[in-house]
């Protein structure tokens, strides 16, 4: 019985300590502060589990994400929507402001191989809370355009020349 009382008292003390730590302003939420490893681990686990649980959409029959025209449309959308500002692109440097994002935005060519098209679609459509990754759906981007971005992402890495050719806007006709 005494053992349970000690465990209970310790649990209460830990709870009070955690409450003071988090609600007393001792935990820094500054974008320049590194999270403790346990926080990074927990947030990464939660993010991965949420994406895995919720990502189930498949492209409609009208969209072939392996089609060259869809990939090119996705590259244009990626460029036009400002994705390269945070994630970079072949031959395109990240915007200076992206250095202030925490966690750092991933270099997509390094991570897209780990994610299925459904997972990429879910992330682009819904965004990732507390990372700076916006929800394209809330910005009014239609599913077809999001699927074209997914097609481009699944094609990464691509050459700088291909990216430039796919994203160059034609000169206005006179």
Regions found by a protein language model. Give the residues of each.
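Short hydrophobic/charged patches on amphipathic alpha-helices used for structural packing
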Residues: 72-75, 121
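Short, flexible segments with low predicted structural confidence
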Residues: 45-46, 95-96, 121
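Extracytoplasmic/periplasmic copper-protein system
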Residues: 160-174
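Extracytoplasmic electron-transfer domains, predominantly the class I c-type cytochrome c fold
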Residues: 100-156
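Periplasmic c-type cytochrome electron-transfer domains
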Residues: 2-72, 137-152, 170-174
